[in-house]
């Protein structure tokens, strides 16, 4: 049973540790567990305790039986305490794996604000030369057009919340294709990744409420799967689930 439990624990974490192969995951778990334990406080093995508990005792030796019962109570307590220590150690290991995973996923370019593009050439350069893993959201606007200022303000907030996404804005008159972006199609949102256009939303404010806020724009983009998950959301959710257990 101990072997089956160990195998189950090892399989649960396959692919989450810093090593990718099954042997690497098993070694990660064993190393983490050994580092977390105090060798002086290791309890008796479960197999030995079960063997002792199932051993026949003389009914005539009442004192010996009572002493044995008291001994088993202590050992049972130590066994339960050991199980709790293993569970806590397992939770710490899971949390460390999640932190390592998020650190790796978060590695890459970070932005955090809205870039003002000054020309069509700069616009094309941004789309073509940015890293392929980066999502680029471009707001094409013009001063005095309803909804453009509000959308710019919302994108400033989203840029801070999603630093791995590159948010840009450019005036329609600066794109070199002003005839394609007349006032009746503004504000327009273009979303790119890897040099490819993912989505094109013209007159985007018509799909929002008359008065919209950052959360409305975020929900709109999430409906189309255009925003990545916020950086520590999964880790925080995992921690909450562990605290509830």
From Swiss-Prot:
Pfam families the record matches = Phosducin (PF02114)
Q: Where does the UniProt entry say this protein principally localizes?
A: cytoplasm
Which InterPro entries does this UniProt record tie to the protein?
Answer: Phosducin, Phosducin-like_reg, Phosducin_N_dom_sf, Phosducin_thioredoxin-like_dom, Thioredoxin-like_sf
Kindly list the biological process annotations in GO that this record carries: regulation of G protein-coupled receptor signaling pathway; visual perception
Q: Tell where it localizes.
A: Cytoplasm, Cytosol; Nucleus; Cell projection, Cilium, Photoreceptor outer segment; Photoreceptor inner segment
Q: At which residues is Phosphoserine found?
A: 73
Q: Where is this region: Thioredoxin fold?
A: 111-245
Tell me where the transmembrane regions lie: none
Per UniProt, the keywords (alphabetical) are: Cell projection, Cilium, Cytoplasm, Nucleus, Phosphoprotein, Sensory transduction, Vision
Phosducin domain residues: 1-244
Q: Where is the composition biased (Basic and acidic residues)?
A: 28-50, 58-69
Gene3D superfamilies cross-referenced by the UniProt entry: Glutaredoxin, Phosducin, domain 2
Q: Which GO terms describe its cellular component?
A: cytosol; nucleus; photoreceptor inner segment; photoreceptor outer segment
What does the PTM comment of the record read? Answer: Light-induced changes in cyclic nucleotide levels modulate the phosphorylation of this protein by cAMP kinase.
Q: Which PANTHER family match?
A: PHOSDUCIN, PHOSDUCIN-LIKE PROTEIN
Protein family (similarity comment) = Belongs to the phosducin family.
What protein does this entry describe? Answer: Phosducin
Starting at the broadest rank, the lineage of the source organism is:
Eukaryota, Metazoa, Chordata, Craniata, Vertebrata
What gene is this protein a product of? PDC
